Amino acid sequence: MKKKYVLLAAFAAAMLTPSVVWAQYPQITDEAKENYKKMMTEERKRSDEAWAKALPIVQKEAREGRPYIPWAGRPYDLPQADIPSFPGAEGGGMYSFGGRGGKVIVVTSLEDSGPGTLREACETGGARIIVFNVAGVIRLKSPISVRAPYVTIAGQTAPGDGICVTGQSFLIDTHDVVIRHMRFRRGAQDVAFRDDAVGGNAVGNIMVDHCSASWGLDENMSIYRHVYNRGADGHGLKLPTVNITIQNSIFSEALDTYNHAFGATIGGYNSMFCRNLFASNISRNSSVGMDLSLIHISEP
């Protein structure tokens, strides 16, 4: 019996050595790490510049009745519409304003950035409804971050086979966002950057309907909490996302580059997760993160 315990202890110790623990993680070169660091530094600078242009518009609309509330952490912190975002909307996010009543922006280019692109439309300030007159694949060189609130992305308006966003992450970093009929395929384009296909710091009033997210390097989707930076000290307050609906969507084929091929982490307050399909992920189909007030409905 003593010999058995010794063997088990030796096996456990071997399994906990760094070479074994990290065996399934990619060996990232110093050059790749530096390239990633440079890319993200440039992207944060560019995103901050876009936000600096959008913020005055957001503040102006806030004075006119569309409040900007990045500190929301309870369902009643965010006002909601009197009617659903669209016929068939359900759950906590069904009364998201999205871009209702705002300007219509037409995506005319499949390029990563520039005039007529999805990135430009997402980074614009003010309530907006984003529609498409092109179809195809949008190959991102850096993540798209939606920071200005009150936006509807109507993927169903695209002709042909619709829109697929690939190459980098799509990040929801605000409130009152409606996304419908979109495909997100993160992909392992840069192993130094491990992130979700769809994620970010979603504040609340979020509706995702008839979308699919695949090939995430962390998870295919994470919507359950956000970090509110109250000042310039860099210390953020972690808060639950509120008023969320993820419905009629598919989360599949997460990539195992980091031994982390996970489906989704969901949570937050006043959330509904219904009629969604998980396929070919190793775990988290789905998992619950942080605080929770959730209705989770799975139907064939």
Report each predicted region and the residues it spans:
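Bacterial N-terminal signal peptides
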Residues: 9-17
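Extracellular beta-strand/beta-solenoid scaffold signature
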Residues: 165-170, 191-200, 215-241, 257-268, ...
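Feature marks extracellular polysaccharide-active and adherence modules
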Residues: 133, 154-159, 180, 185, ...
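Extracellular beta-strand-rich solenoid/capping regions of secreted or surface-exposed proteins
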Residues: 118-126, 138-154, 163-180, 186-204
